[in-house]
């Protein structure tokens, strides 16, 4: 089940979609909605108007939204984490897992910390679906399982 989470200190993004189960290596039975969210971000990220780093395109473009962890999804997660580590340094986890955010700040680590992968991926989602965000359920590529989870997460927060 995808969760609605308030974003603190993330300029331009008032909230984000959080996963409720870890997605990636070692989690073959992650919640289908959570896997679909991560896969959907990879799919729309390759076709969004915001320029995705070219190093990510070959791996991300192989992902399809199946709602199940598969080799293409795991490879895309690994590529994303390697990209973030190269860009932001050794404080970025490269464990092959999109973790559940369990902090109010959306950050982990000492000091100012580092944003969780899912928070950073939500920026990709925001830019790639800017004309409809946060109603990503209205995107034709959004599978029914994710669309239902998004509507449930947003109910009570937004007008239809």
Features from the language model and the residues they span:
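Cell-envelope/ECM-targeting effectors and their regulatory/trafficking segments
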Residues: 1-160
